[in-house]
Amino acid sequence: MAAVSVFPGVRLLSIGDANGEIQRHAEQRELRLEARAGDIALYNAENVCVFKCTITRDTECSRVGKQSFIVTLGCNSVLVQFATPADFCSFYNIIKSCRCPATERSVFSERTEESSAVQYFQFYGYLSQQQNMMQDYVRTGTYQRAILQNHTDFKDKVVLDVGCGSGILSFFAVQAGARKVYAVEASSMAQHAELLVKSNNLTDRVVVIPGKVEEISLPEQVDMIISEPMGYMLFNERMLESYLHAKKFLKPNGNMFPTIGDVHLAPFTDEQLYMEQFTKANFWYQPSFHGVDLSALRGAAVDEYFKQPIVDTFDIRILMAKSVKYTVNFLDAKETDLHRIEIPFSFHMLHSGLVHGLAFWFDVAFIGSIMTVWLSTAPTEPLTHWYQVRCLLQSPIFTKAGDTLSGTVLLIANKKQSYDISIVAQVDQTGSKSSNLLDLKNPFFRYTGSAPSPPPGSHYSSPSENMWNTGGAYTMNTGMGMGGMPTAYDLSSVIGGSSGISHSNLIPLGEPPAVSCPPAPLHSEPQDLTLGTSTNTGIVNHTHSRMGSIMSTGIVQGSAGGQAASNSSSHYPVNNQFTMGGPAISMASPMSITTNTMHYGS
Protein backbone atom coordinates (compact mmCIF):
# COMPACT_ATOMS: atom_id res chain seq x y z
CA MET A 1 0.00 0.00 0.00
CA ALA A 2 1.31 3.44 -0.93
CA ALA A 3 2.34 5.80 1.86
CA VAL A 4 0.08 8.68 2.90
CA SER A 5 1.53 12.17 2.55
CA VAL A 6 -0.02 14.77 4.85
CA PHE A 7 -0.07 18.52 4.15
CA PRO A 8 -1.38 20.80 6.92
CA GLY A 9 -2.51 24.40 6.54
CA VAL A 10 -4.34 23.88 3.21
CA ARG A 11 -7.11 26.28 2.10
CA LEU A 12 -9.99 25.29 -0.19
CA LEU A 13 -11.97 27.36 -2.68
CA SER A 14 -14.75 25.76 -4.73
CA ILE A 15 -16.14 27.36 -7.88
CA GLY A 16 -19.42 26.28 -9.54
CA ASP A 17 -21.27 27.19 -12.73
CA ALA A 18 -24.84 26.16 -11.87
CA ASN A 19 -27.67 27.84 -13.80
CA GLY A 20 -25.20 29.98 -15.69
CA GLU A 21 -24.04 31.79 -12.55
CA ILE A 22 -20.60 31.64 -11.01
CA GLN A 23 -20.80 30.43 -7.42
CA ARG A 24 -17.89 30.55 -5.02
CA HIS A 25 -17.42 28.97 -1.63
CA ALA A 26 -14.33 29.21 0.51
CA GLU A 27 -13.52 27.26 3.64
CA GLN A 28 -12.55 29.80 6.26
CA ARG A 29 -10.55 27.35 8.34
CA GLU A 30 -7.35 25.64 7.35
CA LEU A 31 -7.67 22.02 6.31
CA ARG A 32 -5.46 18.96 6.28
CA LEU A 33 -4.84 17.30 2.91
CA GLU A 34 -3.92 13.64 2.70
CA ALA A 35 -2.63 12.14 -0.55
CA ARG A 36 -2.08 8.49 -1.29
CA ALA A 37 -1.12 7.74 -4.90
CA GLY A 38 -3.91 9.46 -6.88
CA ASP A 39 -6.43 9.75 -4.03
CA ILE A 40 -6.68 13.09 -2.24
CA ALA A 41 -8.89 14.01 0.70
CA LEU A 42 -9.27 17.19 2.76
CA TYR A 43 -10.23 17.09 6.45
CA ASN A 44 -11.21 19.87 8.84
CA ALA A 45 -10.16 20.23 12.47
CA GLU A 46 -12.89 17.79 13.55
CA ASN A 47 -11.41 15.20 11.17
CA VAL A 48 -14.47 15.40 8.92
CA CYS A 49 -13.78 14.89 5.21
CA VAL A 50 -14.96 17.98 3.29
CA PHE A 51 -13.63 16.99 -0.14
CA LYS A 52 -12.38 13.80 -1.76
CA CYS A 53 -11.45 12.79 -5.30
CA THR A 54 -9.21 10.52 -7.35
CA ILE A 55 -6.71 11.97 -9.81
CA THR A 56 -6.13 9.95 -12.98
CA ARG A 57 -4.67 10.62 -16.40
CA ASP A 58 -8.12 11.77 -17.56
CA THR A 59 -8.78 14.17 -14.67
CA GLU A 60 -8.87 17.86 -15.59
CA CYS A 61 -6.39 19.50 -13.26
CA SER A 62 -3.59 22.02 -13.40
CA ARG A 63 -1.05 23.96 -11.42
CA VAL A 64 -2.01 27.54 -10.49
CA GLY A 65 0.78 29.92 -9.51
CA LYS A 66 3.50 28.75 -7.14
CA GLN A 67 1.49 26.88 -4.53
CA SER A 68 -2.04 26.17 -5.76
CA PHE A 69 -3.72 23.34 -7.66
CA ILE A 70 -7.10 23.26 -9.38
CA VAL A 71 -9.24 20.19 -10.11
CA THR A 72 -12.36 20.28 -12.29
CA LEU A 73 -15.06 17.66 -11.70
CA GLY A 74 -18.15 18.12 -13.88
CA CYS A 75 -19.41 21.68 -13.52
CA ASN A 76 -17.43 22.40 -10.38
CA SER A 77 -13.79 23.28 -9.86
CA VAL A 78 -11.85 23.08 -6.64
CA LEU A 79 -8.80 25.24 -5.97
CA VAL A 80 -6.45 23.95 -3.28
CA GLN A 81 -3.90 26.40 -1.88
CA PHE A 82 -0.94 24.95 0.03
CA ALA A 83 0.81 26.55 2.97
CA THR A 84 4.20 26.71 1.26
CA PRO A 85 5.63 26.24 -2.26
CA ALA A 86 7.61 23.28 -0.90
CA ASP A 87 4.41 21.53 0.23
CA PHE A 88 2.86 22.13 -3.15
CA CYS A 89 5.95 20.77 -4.90
CA SER A 90 5.80 17.53 -2.91
CA PHE A 91 2.08 17.17 -3.63
CA TYR A 92 2.53 17.97 -7.31
CA ASN A 93 5.20 15.31 -7.71
CA ILE A 94 2.78 12.72 -6.28
CA ILE A 95 0.06 13.79 -8.71
CA LYS A 96 2.45 13.82 -11.68
CA SER A 97 3.39 10.20 -11.07
CA CYS A 98 -0.30 9.24 -11.27
CA ARG A 99 -1.07 11.27 -14.39
CA CYS A 100 2.04 10.45 -16.44
CA PRO A 101 0.82 8.71 -19.63
CA ALA A 102 2.23 5.26 -20.28
CA THR A 103 3.75 6.56 -23.52
CA GLU A 104 5.76 9.22 -21.67
CA ARG A 105 8.97 7.76 -20.31
CA SER A 106 11.55 9.60 -18.25
CA VAL A 107 15.26 9.56 -18.98
CA PHE A 108 15.65 7.01 -16.19
CA SER A 109 12.98 4.71 -17.63
CA GLU A 110 14.54 4.91 -21.09
CA ARG A 111 17.91 3.69 -19.85
CA THR A 112 16.72 1.12 -17.27
CA GLU A 113 14.94 -2.22 -17.49
CA GLU A 114 11.86 -2.22 -15.29
CA SER A 115 12.90 -5.43 -13.51
CA SER A 116 16.29 -3.92 -12.68
CA ALA A 117 14.73 -0.73 -11.33
CA VAL A 118 12.27 -2.66 -9.14
CA GLN A 119 15.07 -4.75 -7.65
CA TYR A 120 17.30 -1.69 -7.21
CA PHE A 121 14.78 0.43 -5.32
CA GLN A 122 13.60 -2.52 -3.26
CA PHE A 123 17.20 -3.12 -2.16
CA TYR A 124 17.70 0.47 -1.02
CA GLY A 125 14.31 0.52 0.69
CA TYR A 126 15.61 -1.73 3.49
CA LEU A 127 16.86 -0.06 6.67
CA SER A 128 19.53 -2.77 6.94
CA GLN A 129 21.09 -1.66 3.65
CA GLN A 130 21.03 1.99 4.71
CA GLN A 131 22.70 0.90 7.94
CA ASN A 132 25.46 -0.87 6.01
CA MET A 133 26.31 2.37 4.24
CA MET A 134 25.91 4.60 7.28
CA GLN A 135 28.20 2.36 9.36
CA ASP A 136 30.97 2.80 6.81
CA TYR A 137 32.71 5.39 8.96
CA VAL A 138 35.07 6.46 6.17
CA ARG A 139 32.15 7.21 3.85
CA THR A 140 29.88 8.90 6.39
CA GLY A 141 32.62 10.72 8.25
CA THR A 142 34.18 12.08 5.08
CA TYR A 143 30.86 13.45 3.85
CA GLN A 144 30.20 15.14 7.19
CA ARG A 145 33.70 16.60 7.35
CA ALA A 146 33.54 17.85 3.75
CA ILE A 147 30.19 19.55 4.34
CA LEU A 148 30.92 21.04 7.78
CA GLN A 149 34.42 22.25 6.92
CA ASN A 150 32.99 24.03 3.87
CA HIS A 151 30.10 25.55 5.83
CA THR A 152 30.20 28.77 3.81
CA ASP A 153 29.03 26.79 0.77
CA PHE A 154 25.91 25.72 2.70
CA LYS A 155 25.01 28.55 5.08
CA ASP A 156 21.66 30.08 4.06
CA LYS A 157 21.81 28.13 0.79
CA VAL A 158 19.29 25.86 -0.96
CA VAL A 159 20.54 22.28 -1.31
CA LEU A 160 19.37 19.28 -3.35
CA ASP A 161 20.15 15.81 -1.99
CA VAL A 162 19.89 13.27 -4.84
CA GLY A 163 18.98 9.78 -3.66
CA CYS A 164 18.87 10.85 -0.03
CA GLY A 165 18.18 7.39 1.43
CA SER A 166 17.82 7.87 5.18
CA GLY A 167 18.48 11.59 4.71
CA ILE A 168 21.82 11.59 6.53
CA LEU A 169 23.49 13.96 4.04
CA SER A 170 20.52 16.33 4.26
CA PHE A 171 21.00 16.49 8.03
CA PHE A 172 24.68 17.30 7.49
CA ALA A 173 23.67 20.15 5.17
CA VAL A 174 21.35 21.54 7.86
CA GLN A 175 24.17 21.24 10.41
CA ALA A 176 26.24 23.43 8.08
CA GLY A 177 23.48 26.06 8.00
CA ALA A 178 21.48 25.27 4.85
CA ARG A 179 18.26 27.29 4.62
CA LYS A 180 16.34 24.61 2.72
CA VAL A 181 17.17 21.05 1.66
CA TYR A 182 15.16 19.13 -0.93
CA ALA A 183 15.77 15.44 -0.26
CA VAL A 184 14.77 13.30 -3.26
CA GLU A 185 14.39 9.53 -2.80
CA ALA A 186 12.70 7.09 -5.20
CA SER A 187 12.60 4.04 -2.92
CA SER A 188 10.26 3.42 0.01
CA MET A 189 13.06 4.74 2.24
CA ALA A 190 11.54 8.18 1.60
CA GLN A 191 8.91 7.39 4.26
CA HIS A 192 11.60 6.66 6.83
CA ALA A 193 13.51 9.80 5.86
CA GLU A 194 10.38 11.90 6.34
CA LEU A 195 9.86 10.37 9.78
CA LEU A 196 13.44 11.25 10.75
CA VAL A 197 12.94 14.81 9.54
CA LYS A 198 9.83 15.18 11.70
CA SER A 199 11.38 13.54 14.76
CA ASN A 200 14.38 15.89 14.47
CA ASN A 201 12.06 18.93 14.19
CA LEU A 202 13.40 19.93 10.79
CA THR A 203 10.21 19.98 8.71
CA ASP A 204 10.72 23.70 8.09
CA ARG A 205 14.15 23.11 6.53
CA VAL A 206 14.15 19.62 4.98
CA VAL A 207 11.54 18.64 2.40
CA VAL A 208 11.48 14.95 1.44
CA ILE A 209 10.31 14.47 -2.15
CA PRO A 210 9.40 10.89 -3.11
CA GLY A 211 10.34 10.09 -6.70
CA LYS A 212 13.18 9.92 -9.19
CA VAL A 213 15.19 13.07 -9.79
CA GLU A 214 14.48 12.66 -13.51
CA GLU A 215 10.72 12.84 -12.87
CA ILE A 216 10.22 15.36 -10.06
CA SER A 217 10.07 19.15 -10.03
CA LEU A 218 11.40 21.66 -7.50
CA PRO A 219 9.87 24.99 -6.48
CA GLU A 220 13.22 26.77 -6.89
CA GLN A 221 16.73 26.38 -8.21
CA VAL A 222 19.44 25.18 -5.82
CA ASP A 223 22.90 26.42 -4.85
CA MET A 224 24.41 23.01 -4.08
CA ILE A 225 23.79 19.39 -5.09
CA ILE A 226 24.92 16.63 -2.73
CA SER A 227 24.73 12.91 -3.29
CA GLU A 228 26.48 9.60 -2.75
CA PRO A 229 26.18 8.19 -6.29
CA MET A 230 29.30 6.01 -6.43
CA GLY A 231 29.17 2.29 -7.10
CA TYR A 232 31.83 -0.37 -7.54
CA MET A 233 34.52 0.94 -9.89
CA LEU A 234 32.79 4.33 -9.40
CA PHE A 235 30.36 3.80 -12.29
CA ASN A 236 28.31 0.73 -11.28
CA GLU A 237 24.55 1.24 -10.72
CA ARG A 238 24.63 4.22 -13.12
CA MET A 239 23.46 6.61 -10.40
CA LEU A 240 26.12 9.06 -11.52
CA GLU A 241 23.86 9.80 -14.49
CA SER A 242 21.02 10.76 -12.14
CA TYR A 243 23.50 12.93 -10.25
CA LEU A 244 24.46 14.71 -13.47
CA HIS A 245 20.81 14.98 -14.54
CA ALA A 246 20.09 16.92 -11.34
CA LYS A 247 22.18 19.80 -12.69
CA LYS A 248 19.02 21.05 -14.41
CA PHE A 249 18.07 22.37 -10.95
CA LEU A 250 21.51 23.92 -10.25
CA LYS A 251 21.98 27.67 -10.34
CA PRO A 252 24.78 29.10 -12.49
CA ASN A 253 28.05 28.88 -10.55
CA GLY A 254 26.48 26.34 -8.18
CA ASN A 255 28.58 23.52 -6.76
CA MET A 256 28.37 19.75 -6.42
CA PHE A 257 29.60 17.48 -3.61
CA PRO A 258 31.40 15.33 -4.73
CA THR A 259 32.93 17.53 -7.42
CA ILE A 260 35.25 15.17 -9.30
CA GLY A 261 35.88 11.44 -9.45
CA ASP A 262 39.15 9.66 -10.25
CA VAL A 263 39.24 6.02 -11.33
CA HIS A 264 42.64 4.38 -10.82
CA LEU A 265 43.74 1.19 -12.55
CA ALA A 266 46.95 -0.82 -12.34
CA PRO A 267 48.16 -4.27 -13.49
CA PHE A 268 48.45 -6.93 -10.81
CA THR A 269 49.79 -10.45 -10.36
CA ASP A 270 47.87 -13.00 -8.30
CA GLU A 271 48.30 -16.64 -9.25
CA GLN A 272 46.12 -17.79 -6.35
CA LEU A 273 43.11 -15.76 -7.48
CA TYR A 274 43.56 -16.88 -11.07
CA MET A 275 43.71 -20.56 -10.08
CA GLU A 276 40.68 -20.16 -7.80
CA GLN A 277 38.55 -19.20 -10.77
CA PHE A 278 39.87 -22.07 -12.87
CA THR A 279 39.32 -24.52 -10.03
CA LYS A 280 35.69 -23.50 -9.73
CA ALA A 281 35.20 -23.97 -13.46
CA ASN A 282 36.84 -27.40 -13.31
CA PHE A 283 33.76 -28.75 -11.55
CA TRP A 284 32.28 -28.95 -15.04
CA TYR A 285 35.25 -30.98 -16.29
CA GLN A 286 33.96 -34.15 -14.63
CA PRO A 287 33.33 -37.02 -17.09
CA SER A 288 31.03 -38.85 -14.68
CA PHE A 289 29.11 -36.69 -12.21
CA HIS A 290 26.53 -39.13 -10.88
CA GLY A 291 26.96 -40.90 -14.20
CA VAL A 292 26.64 -37.72 -16.30
CA ASP A 293 29.47 -36.28 -18.44
CA LEU A 294 29.63 -32.52 -17.65
CA SER A 295 32.77 -31.73 -19.63
CA ALA A 296 30.91 -30.17 -22.56
CA LEU A 297 30.08 -27.19 -20.32
CA ARG A 298 33.56 -26.62 -18.96
CA GLY A 299 34.38 -23.93 -21.54
CA ALA A 300 31.18 -22.04 -20.83
CA ALA A 301 31.90 -22.26 -17.09
CA VAL A 302 35.37 -20.75 -17.57
CA ASP A 303 33.88 -17.88 -19.57
CA GLU A 304 31.25 -17.26 -16.90
CA TYR A 305 33.63 -17.23 -13.93
CA PHE A 306 36.13 -15.00 -15.70
CA LYS A 307 33.35 -12.56 -16.61
CA GLN A 308 32.93 -11.79 -12.91
CA PRO A 309 34.83 -8.78 -11.54
CA ILE A 310 36.34 -9.67 -8.15
CA VAL A 311 35.31 -7.44 -5.23
CA ASP A 312 37.81 -7.66 -2.36
CA THR A 313 40.99 -6.03 -1.11
CA PHE A 314 44.62 -6.93 -1.67
CA ASP A 315 48.22 -6.34 -0.64
CA ILE A 316 49.60 -3.48 -2.72
CA ARG A 317 52.75 -5.46 -3.47
CA ILE A 318 50.80 -7.39 -6.11
CA LEU A 319 50.66 -4.20 -8.21
CA MET A 320 53.25 -4.28 -11.00
CA ALA A 321 53.18 -0.67 -12.23
CA LYS A 322 52.12 2.84 -11.28
CA SER A 323 48.40 3.39 -11.61
CA VAL A 324 46.74 5.29 -14.44
CA LYS A 325 44.04 7.82 -13.52
CA TYR A 326 40.83 8.64 -15.39
CA THR A 327 39.05 11.79 -14.19
CA VAL A 328 35.40 12.81 -14.45
CA ASN A 329 34.50 16.40 -13.56
CA PHE A 330 30.87 16.22 -12.44
CA LEU A 331 30.35 19.96 -12.95
CA ASP A 332 31.23 19.67 -16.65
CA ALA A 333 30.24 16.12 -17.59
CA LYS A 334 26.99 15.22 -19.35
CA GLU A 335 24.88 12.11 -18.82
CA THR A 336 25.72 10.84 -22.29
CA ASP A 337 29.44 11.00 -21.47
CA LEU A 338 28.89 8.02 -19.17
CA HIS A 339 27.19 5.82 -21.76
CA ARG A 340 30.55 4.85 -23.27
CA ILE A 341 33.70 5.27 -21.20
CA GLU A 342 37.03 4.53 -22.86
CA ILE A 343 40.16 4.48 -20.70
CA PRO A 344 43.43 4.06 -22.61
CA PHE A 345 46.43 2.96 -20.55
CA SER A 346 50.17 2.59 -20.90
CA PHE A 347 52.02 1.07 -17.94
CA HIS A 348 55.78 1.10 -17.44
CA MET A 349 56.29 -2.22 -15.70
CA LEU A 350 58.22 -2.03 -12.44
CA HIS A 351 58.42 -5.79 -11.85
CA SER A 352 58.84 -8.93 -13.92
CA GLY A 353 56.19 -11.64 -13.79
CA LEU A 354 52.73 -12.66 -14.95
CA VAL A 355 50.05 -10.00 -15.27
CA HIS A 356 46.75 -11.64 -14.32
CA GLY A 357 44.53 -8.59 -14.75
CA LEU A 358 43.81 -4.98 -13.81
CA ALA A 359 42.93 -3.66 -10.34
CA PHE A 360 40.52 -0.71 -9.99
CA TRP A 361 39.67 1.75 -7.22
CA PHE A 362 38.44 5.33 -7.09
CA ASP A 363 38.79 8.61 -5.22
CA VAL A 364 36.28 11.47 -5.16
CA ALA A 365 37.00 15.06 -4.16
CA PHE A 366 34.73 17.60 -2.46
CA ILE A 367 36.12 20.91 -3.71
CA GLY A 368 34.69 23.61 -1.47
CA SER A 369 35.34 27.29 -0.90
CA ILE A 370 37.39 26.61 2.23
CA MET A 371 39.09 23.28 1.56
CA THR A 372 39.17 20.18 -0.60
CA VAL A 373 38.41 16.87 1.11
CA TRP A 374 39.08 13.48 -0.50
CA LEU A 375 37.26 10.19 -0.05
CA SER A 376 39.48 7.33 -1.19
CA THR A 377 38.90 3.63 -1.75
CA ALA A 378 42.59 2.97 -2.48
CA PRO A 379 44.07 -0.29 -1.14
CA THR A 380 46.29 1.72 1.22
CA GLU A 381 43.34 3.44 2.88
CA PRO A 382 40.89 2.12 5.50
CA LEU A 383 38.55 -0.38 3.91
CA THR A 384 35.15 0.90 2.75
CA HIS A 385 32.02 -0.90 1.57
CA TRP A 386 33.27 -0.28 -2.00
CA TYR A 387 36.43 -2.37 -1.39
CA GLN A 388 38.51 -2.61 -4.60
CA VAL A 389 37.66 -4.39 -7.86
CA ARG A 390 39.89 -6.65 -9.93
CA CYS A 391 39.23 -7.77 -13.49
CA LEU A 392 41.07 -10.89 -14.62
CA LEU A 393 42.46 -11.60 -18.06
CA GLN A 394 41.58 -15.05 -19.36
CA SER A 395 45.23 -15.61 -20.30
CA PRO A 396 47.98 -14.05 -18.15
CA ILE A 397 50.72 -12.06 -19.92
CA PHE A 398 54.40 -12.34 -18.99
CA THR A 399 56.21 -9.01 -18.73
CA LYS A 400 59.67 -7.92 -17.70
CA ALA A 401 60.61 -4.88 -15.66
CA GLY A 402 60.99 -2.00 -18.10
CA ASP A 403 58.40 -3.35 -20.57
CA THR A 404 55.38 -1.29 -21.60
CA LEU A 405 51.91 -2.76 -21.16
CA SER A 406 49.39 -0.81 -23.21
CA GLY A 407 45.75 -1.19 -24.12
CA THR A 408 42.23 -0.02 -23.43
CA VAL A 409 39.45 -0.50 -20.90
CA LEU A 410 36.04 0.09 -22.47
CA LEU A 411 32.87 0.37 -20.37
CA ILE A 412 29.56 0.23 -22.23
CA ALA A 413 26.44 1.11 -20.21
CA ASN A 414 23.58 -1.38 -20.25
CA LYS A 415 19.95 -1.30 -19.12
CA LYS A 416 20.74 -3.39 -16.04
CA GLN A 417 22.07 -0.22 -14.38
CA SER A 418 25.61 -1.41 -14.91
CA TYR A 419 28.36 -1.80 -17.51
CA ASP A 420 29.83 -4.37 -19.86
CA ILE A 421 33.62 -4.19 -19.56
CA SER A 422 36.07 -4.96 -22.34
CA ILE A 423 39.80 -5.12 -21.57
CA VAL A 424 42.54 -5.47 -24.19
CA ALA A 425 46.21 -5.46 -23.08
CA GLN A 426 49.46 -5.97 -24.99
CA VAL A 427 53.17 -6.03 -24.18
CA ASP A 428 54.68 -3.64 -26.72
CA GLN A 429 58.12 -5.26 -26.68
CA THR A 430 56.96 -8.84 -27.35
CA GLY A 431 53.54 -8.44 -28.93
CA SER A 432 51.97 -10.74 -26.31
CA LYS A 433 48.28 -9.91 -26.08
CA SER A 434 45.33 -10.84 -23.88
CA SER A 435 41.76 -9.65 -23.36
CA ASN A 436 38.53 -10.34 -21.51
CA LEU A 437 34.86 -9.35 -21.41
CA LEU A 438 33.30 -8.83 -17.98
CA ASP A 439 29.85 -8.13 -16.54
CA LEU A 440 29.98 -5.53 -13.77
CA LYS A 441 26.38 -6.37 -12.83
CA ASN A 442 27.50 -9.81 -11.64
CA PRO A 443 30.61 -9.40 -9.44
CA PHE A 444 32.08 -12.07 -7.19
CA PHE A 445 32.32 -10.92 -3.56
CA ARG A 446 35.53 -12.57 -2.39
CA TYR A 447 36.36 -10.54 0.71
CA THR A 448 36.55 -12.73 3.84
CA GLY A 449 37.64 -10.28 6.56
CA SER A 450 41.12 -11.74 6.90
CA ALA A 451 44.30 -9.84 6.08
CA PRO A 452 45.26 -10.06 2.40
CA SER A 453 48.30 -12.22 1.75
CA PRO A 454 51.45 -10.70 0.26
CA PRO A 455 52.64 -12.10 -3.06
CA PRO A 456 55.14 -14.98 -2.89
CA GLY A 457 58.75 -13.86 -2.59
CA SER A 458 57.98 -10.66 -0.68
CA HIS A 459 60.35 -11.39 2.23
CA TYR A 460 63.94 -10.18 1.93
CA SER A 461 64.98 -11.29 5.39
CA SER A 462 64.04 -14.30 7.50
CA PRO A 463 60.50 -13.85 8.88
CA SER A 464 61.29 -16.45 11.56
CA GLU A 465 64.31 -14.49 12.78
CA ASN A 466 62.34 -11.24 12.67
CA MET A 467 59.60 -12.85 14.76
CA TRP A 468 62.03 -13.48 17.65
CA ASN A 469 64.01 -10.27 17.27
CA THR A 470 61.10 -7.85 17.60
CA GLY A 471 62.19 -5.24 20.11
CA GLY A 472 61.95 -7.29 23.29
CA ALA A 473 58.17 -7.60 23.09
CA TYR A 474 58.53 -11.14 24.39
CA THR A 475 61.20 -12.57 26.67
CA MET A 476 61.82 -16.07 27.91
CA ASN A 477 61.14 -14.86 31.45
CA THR A 478 57.55 -13.94 30.60
CA GLY A 479 57.19 -17.12 28.58
CA MET A 480 58.25 -19.53 31.34
CA GLY A 481 55.84 -20.98 33.84
CA MET A 482 56.39 -23.06 36.93
CA GLY A 483 59.29 -25.48 36.70
CA GLY A 484 60.84 -23.58 33.79
CA MET A 485 58.39 -24.99 31.26
CA PRO A 486 57.24 -22.65 28.50
CA THR A 487 53.64 -21.53 28.94
CA ALA A 488 51.08 -20.96 26.22
CA TYR A 489 51.42 -17.51 24.76
CA ASP A 490 49.88 -15.35 22.10
CA LEU A 491 52.18 -14.76 19.15
CA SER A 492 50.62 -11.34 18.80
CA SER A 493 52.74 -10.37 21.81
CA VAL A 494 55.75 -11.17 19.68
CA ILE A 495 54.82 -9.87 16.27
CA GLY A 496 52.04 -7.42 17.13
CA GLY A 497 53.55 -5.41 19.98
CA SER A 498 53.30 -1.67 20.12
CA SER A 499 56.72 -1.21 18.59
CA GLY A 500 56.47 -4.00 16.07
CA ILE A 501 55.10 -4.23 12.56
CA SER A 502 53.21 -7.20 11.21
CA HIS A 503 54.75 -8.01 7.87
CA SER A 504 51.82 -10.19 6.92
CA ASN A 505 49.37 -7.30 6.73
CA LEU A 506 50.13 -4.11 4.92
CA ILE A 507 46.53 -2.99 4.55
CA PRO A 508 44.91 -0.99 7.39
CA LEU A 509 41.51 -2.68 7.55
CA GLY A 510 39.89 -1.12 10.55
CA GLU A 511 42.28 1.46 11.89
CA PRO A 512 42.00 5.10 10.80
CA PRO A 513 45.11 6.03 8.81
CA ALA A 514 47.51 8.86 9.34
CA VAL A 515 45.95 12.24 8.69
CA SER A 516 47.14 14.24 5.71
CA CYS A 517 46.94 17.94 6.56
CA PRO A 518 47.94 20.48 3.91
CA PRO A 519 49.25 23.87 5.04
CA ALA A 520 47.20 27.00 4.49
CA PRO A 521 45.57 27.83 2.18
CA LEU A 522 43.41 24.75 2.65
CA HIS A 523 43.08 23.92 -1.04
CA SER A 524 44.63 21.00 -2.85
CA GLU A 525 47.08 21.73 -5.61
CA PRO A 526 45.31 22.75 -8.86
CA GLN A 527 44.75 19.83 -11.18
CA ASP A 528 43.40 19.13 -14.63
CA LEU A 529 39.70 18.36 -14.19
CA THR A 530 38.92 17.64 -17.83
CA LEU A 531 36.43 14.84 -18.37
CA GLY A 532 37.90 11.68 -19.74
CA THR A 533 41.57 12.34 -19.03
CA SER A 534 43.85 9.50 -18.05
CA THR A 535 47.23 10.15 -16.46
CA ASN A 536 49.95 8.16 -14.77
CA THR A 537 50.22 8.54 -11.00
CA GLY A 538 52.82 7.54 -8.51
CA ILE A 539 52.32 4.12 -7.02
CA VAL A 540 50.31 4.45 -3.84
CA ASN A 541 52.30 5.21 -0.71
CA HIS A 542 51.97 2.68 2.07
CA THR A 543 51.79 3.20 5.81
CA HIS A 544 52.41 0.10 7.95
CA SER A 545 49.50 -0.67 10.22
CA ARG A 546 48.38 -3.37 12.60
CA MET A 547 45.20 -5.10 11.58
CA GLY A 548 42.00 -3.62 12.94
CA SER A 549 38.56 -5.19 13.24
CA ILE A 550 35.99 -5.89 10.57
CA MET A 551 32.34 -6.87 10.78
CA SER A 552 30.04 -7.87 7.98
CA THR A 553 27.67 -4.93 8.31
CA GLY A 554 30.28 -2.20 8.39
CA ILE A 555 33.70 -1.19 9.54
CA VAL A 556 34.32 -1.37 13.29
CA GLN A 557 36.04 1.73 14.56
CA GLY A 558 39.75 1.26 15.12
CA SER A 559 42.04 3.01 17.52
CA ALA A 560 43.38 6.32 16.37
CA GLY A 561 46.78 5.23 17.55
CA GLY A 562 47.51 8.56 19.16
CA GLN A 563 47.12 10.48 15.92
CA ALA A 564 44.77 13.42 16.03
CA ALA A 565 43.54 15.86 13.42
CA SER A 566 44.64 19.40 14.19
CA ASN A 567 42.42 21.14 11.65
CA SER A 568 38.90 20.26 12.77
CA SER A 569 36.40 23.01 12.13
CA SER A 570 36.04 25.58 14.89
CA HIS A 571 32.56 26.34 13.60
CA TYR A 572 31.25 22.78 13.47
CA PRO A 573 33.49 20.49 15.51
CA VAL A 574 33.11 16.80 14.72
CA ASN A 575 32.97 14.43 17.67
CA ASN A 576 35.89 12.03 17.20
CA GLN A 577 34.41 9.66 19.78
CA PHE A 578 32.84 7.68 16.96
CA THR A 579 35.76 8.20 14.55
CA MET A 580 33.31 9.78 12.15
CA GLY A 581 35.40 11.95 9.90
CA GLY A 582 38.12 12.32 12.50
CA PRO A 583 41.61 11.00 11.89
CA ALA A 584 40.37 8.85 9.01
CA ILE A 585 39.94 11.75 6.62
CA SER A 586 42.65 12.93 4.24
CA MET A 587 42.51 16.58 3.26
CA ALA A 588 44.73 16.00 0.25
CA SER A 589 44.36 13.36 -2.39
CA PRO A 590 45.88 10.13 -1.04
CA MET A 591 46.82 9.24 -4.59
CA SER A 592 48.52 12.52 -5.46
CA ILE A 593 50.39 14.00 -2.50
CA THR A 594 51.96 17.37 -3.28
CA THR A 595 55.49 18.16 -2.23
CA ASN A 596 54.33 20.71 0.36
CA THR A 597 51.85 18.34 2.01
CA MET A 598 52.66 17.13 5.51
CA HIS A 599 51.98 13.49 6.40
CA TYR A 600 51.65 12.70 10.07
CA GLY A 601 52.40 9.23 11.31
CA SER A 602 53.74 7.93 8.00
Curated annotation (Swiss-Prot):
Catalytic activity from the UniProt record: L-arginyl-[protein] + 2 S-adenosyl-L-methionine = N(omega),N(omega)-dimethyl-L-arginyl-[protein] + 2 S-adenosyl-L-homocysteine + 2 H(+)
Any one GO biological process: regulation of DNA-templated transcription
- Please give the SUPFAM superfamilies that the UniProt record associates with this protein: S-adenosyl-L-methionine-dependent methyltransferases
The record, for Pfam families, names: CARM1, PrmA, PRMT_C
**InterPro entries, alphabetized:** Arg_MeTrfase, Histone-Arg_MeTrfase_N, PH-like_dom_sf, PRMT_dom, SAM-dependent_MTases_sf
Major localization class? nucleus
Q: Name one GO cellular component term.
A: nuclear replication fork
Q: Does the keyword Protein transport apply?
A: no
Broadest EC class? transferase
Where does the UniProt annotation locate this protein? Nucleus; Cytoplasm; Chromosome
EC number(s) per entry: 2.1.1.319
The entry lists its GO molecular-function terms as: histone H3R17 methyltransferase activity; histone H3R2 methyltransferase activity; histone H3R26 methyltransferase activity; histone methyltransferase activity; protein-arginine N-methyltransferase activity; protein-arginine omega-N asymmetric methyltransferase activity; transcription cis-regulatory region binding; transcription coactivator activity
Annotated region Transactivation domain: the residues are 470-602
Keywords assigned by UniProt, alphabetized: Chromatin regulator, Chromosome, Cytoplasm, Methyltransferase, Nucleus, S-adenosyl-L-methionine, Transcription, Transcription regulation, Transferase
| Taxonomy, superkingdom | Eukaryota
Q: Give me the residues that bind S-adenosyl-L-methionine, please.
A: Q130, R139, G163, E185, E214, S242
Q: Which residues form the SAM-dependent MTase PRMT-type domain?
A: 117-424
Assembly notes: Homodimer.
Identify its protein family.
Answer: Belongs to the class I-like SAM-binding methyltransferase superfamily. Protein arginine N-methyltransferase family.
This molecule's function is given as: Methylates (mono- and asymmetric dimethylation) the guanidino nitrogens of arginyl residues in several proteins involved in DNA packaging, transcription regulation, pre-mRNA splicing, and mRNA stability. Recruited to promoters upon gene activation together with histone acetyltransferases from EP300/P300 and p160 families, methylates histone H3 at 'Arg-17' (H3R17me) and activates transcription via chromatin remodeling.
Protein name, entry field: Histone-arginine methyltransferase CARM1
Q: Species name for this entry?
A: Xenopus laevis
Gene name tied to this protein? carm1
